[in-house]
Amino acid sequence: WRLSMEPFVEQIWRHPVKSLGAEKVNSVTLTKGETLPWDRVWALTYENSRFDISNPVWSPCSVFLRGSIAPLFLAVTAKVIELDGSIEFNHPKLKSIHLNLYDQLDRQEFIKWVAPICPENAPKPSKLCRVIGRGMTDTDYPSISINSISSLTDLSNRMNKHLHPRRFRGNIWIDGLKPWSELE
């Protein structure tokens, strides 16, 4: 913990599958105009989703299964093996699984793996999809979410409840600033 009021990067998170698996990383190389590497590379569509698998382009989050629909998704952790592009997924209620989502059979295996943590009244998972060259962020342009630890701490104190950074799905968490100074 630092006492200065100089901003510094406290945490870096990426989410290889949108809303399904967070991974804390120590460092990352950023490229102007691109999402954080390995962030939201994949997204999970549901039956009758409007996402066009045959012409994959950026789409709003409403066409994907996500934590607001399936809250148990938020407990998934991921570890990207950058050497081969495979990902290890873990969830407290499921057996760990290690897959290469570039492989069709592994994508089908992922859908089977995630099905038990989908609510019964929610749309059923259908296909894992991606858009070449960008992550499936919530913006229609490649973006990186930068959040403030001090603002999160202040919000937690006001709510009298610990809020974990993973709840907000941010990429880069900075600290060393006054709460809410990012809004000034």
Each model region followed by its residue ranges:
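Electropositive, beta-rich accessory/interaction domains or terminal extensions
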Residues: 5-182
